């Protein structure tokens, strides 16, 4: 390090290394120097960080109205109109409640009306957009979002995950900013798999069913939970992260296979013998919209768990038209995604209308919903995606109905030969 008494040629900025002659001014500190250029650069960095922090703070107070939330969901999620409306209202009311609680002073809190939290239960078949709806909501609201699988959870003290590990995922999604995590969204999937195995309470302990429901009660309602920072089981010599779940929105979802029979029996819509009314699978799925708490209790959810999920909404099985729309219409439609991938190799990808219909029909036949569309696209395009990057002659790939249904190769259109090559 250069000293003050040395020649000016030896004095250099400790950050960029420029000499005193190369800069306008060199500021001396205790054993270090900084030039005017580095000072200006540091000021720019600080201003950018402050601006980013301001944007984050302002985004936290940007609460869209239900119609705006619905409109955003419309851009990305096809169908499920009733579910989108219910979710838009429920999410708006939840965060309106959060803002109201944050604005109340300690003195006003005594006399103010306390609004209870309204968690959401989503019921519907697999591949119909339950998880995607929740993910899209979180992205619009700019809040931390975590997905958990209820089947991995067990009651405390047994092999498996504790319910507190769900909260750890949310904290990790918020980059360990606990305050931000406390206003996030947790999506718990496969909640129907933790239903009690029998309608009557069992003598033996149901550690992955009723036991998990009991363990979830407190965090659903709102409590200060102790979360192990590295996950896993708690032990006494470990530091814990304290998180308040009062303002965390829980969206729990499941397929609830067999629930339609319970609803139908309760409503008297099932009969036996030759006089029994005929009904289709579509009628069964529409029965979900008539679900009552007593049906969920008979399915295997305990009353206390049902009571903490006051907003119940359903999604319906996607038909061919809806799957066709999912393939082509949303901003991140599956067809557009694959077209973009081919574009990166300089190749244009096209689909015949009949090919898209065949893909949608296959997804309906396999009963995999929207989730199965990508698997079918991979089956159809996999071989050609292997060949295209190695060939410079391919200009266009056209996917036909035969390529989908008969494993035929998609049509390959080569580049047009240049005029010089023609004249030769």
UniProtKB/Swiss-Prot annotation:
Gene Ontology terms, MF aspect: ATP binding; ATP hydrolysis activity; ATP-dependent protein folding chaperone; protein dimerization activity; unfolded protein binding; zinc ion binding
- Determine the domain of life of the protein's source: Bacteria
Positions contributing to ATP binding: 125-132
Q: Does the keyword ATP-binding apply?
A: yes
| CDD domains recorded | RecA-like_ClpX
Alphabetically, which GO biological process terms does the record hold? cell division; proteolysis involved in protein catabolic process
Q: Indicate the segments forming the ClpX-type ZB domain, all copies.
A: 1-54
Mention any Pfam family matching this sequence.
AAA_2
Residue numbers binding Zn(2+): 13, 16, 35, 38
Q: Which UniProt keywords apply?
A: ATP-binding, Chaperone, Metal-binding, Nucleotide-binding, Zinc
Q: Which InterPro entries match?
A: AAA+_ATPase, ATP-dep_Clp_protease_ClpX, ATPase_AAA_core, Clp_ATPase_C, Clp_protease_ATP-bd_su_ClpX, ClpX_bact, P-loop_NTPase, Znf_CppX_C4
Task: Give the protein family.
Answer: Belongs to the ClpX chaperone family.
Outline what the protein does: ATP-dependent specificity component of the Clp protease. It directs the protease to specific substrates. Can perform chaperone functions in the absence of ClpP.
Subunit structure of this chain's protein: Component of the ClpX-ClpP complex. Forms a hexameric ring that, in the presence of ATP, binds to fourteen ClpP subunits assembled into a disk-like structure with a central cavity, resembling the structure of eukaryotic proteasomes.
Tell me what this protein is called.
ATP-dependent Clp protease ATP-binding subunit ClpX
Write down the species.
Leifsonia xyli subsp. xyli (strain CTCB07)
Upper classification of the source organism reads:
Bacteria, Bacillati, Actinomycetota, Actinomycetes, Micrococcales
């Amino acid at each position: 390090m250069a000293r003050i008494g040395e020649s000016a040629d030896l004095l250099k900025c400790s950050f960029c290394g420029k000499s005193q002659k190369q800069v306008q001014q060199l500021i001396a500190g205790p054993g270090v120097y900084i030039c005017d250029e580095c000072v200006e650069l540091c000021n720019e960095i600080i201003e950018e960080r402050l601006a980013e922090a301001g944007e984050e703070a302002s985004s936290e107070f940007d609460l869209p109205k239900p119609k705006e939330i619905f409109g955003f969901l419309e851009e990305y999620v096809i169908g499920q109109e009733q579910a989108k409306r219910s979710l838009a209202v429920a999410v708006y009311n939840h965060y309106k409640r959060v803002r109201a609680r944050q604005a109340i002073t300690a003195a006003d809190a005594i006399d103010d009306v306390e609004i209870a939290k309204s968690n959401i239960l989503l019921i519907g078949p697999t591949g119909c957009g339950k998880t995607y709806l929740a993910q899209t909501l979180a992205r619009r609201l700019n809040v931390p979002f975590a997905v958990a699988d209820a089947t991995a959870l067990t009651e405390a003290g047994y092999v498996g995950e504790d319910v507190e590990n769900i909260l750890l995922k949310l904290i990790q999604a918020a980059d360990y900013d606990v305050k931000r995590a406390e206003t996030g969204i947790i999506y718990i999937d496969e909640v129907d798999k933790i239903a009690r195995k029998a309608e009557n309470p069992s003598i033996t302990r149901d550690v992955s069913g009723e036991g998990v429901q009991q363990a979830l009660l407190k965090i659903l309602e709102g409590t200060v939970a102790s979360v192990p920072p590295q996950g896993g089981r708690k032990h006494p010599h470990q530091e814990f992260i304290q998180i308040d779940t009062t303002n965390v929105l829980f969206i729990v979802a499941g397929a609830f296979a067999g629930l339609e029979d319970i609803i139908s029996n309760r409503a008297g819509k099932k009969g036996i013998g030759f006089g029994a009314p005929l009904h289709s699978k579509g009628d069964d799925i529409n029965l979900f919209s008539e679900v009552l708490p007593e049906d969920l209790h008979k399915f295997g959810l305990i009353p206390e768990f049902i009571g903490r999920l006051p907003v119940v909404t359903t999604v319906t099985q996607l038909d061919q038209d809806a799957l066709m729309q999912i393939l082509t219409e949303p901003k991140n439609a599956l067809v557009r995604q694959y077209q973009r991938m081919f574009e990166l190799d300089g190749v244009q990808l096209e689909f015949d209308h009949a090919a898209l219909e065949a893909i949608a029909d296959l997804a309906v036949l396999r009963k995999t919903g929207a989730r199965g569309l990508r698997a079918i696209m991979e089956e159809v395009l996999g071989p050609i995606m292997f060949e295209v990057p190695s060939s410079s002659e391919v200009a266009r790939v056209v996917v036909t109905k035969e390529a989908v249904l008969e494993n035929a190769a998609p049509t390959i259109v080569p580049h047009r030969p240049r005029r010089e090559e023609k004249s030769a």
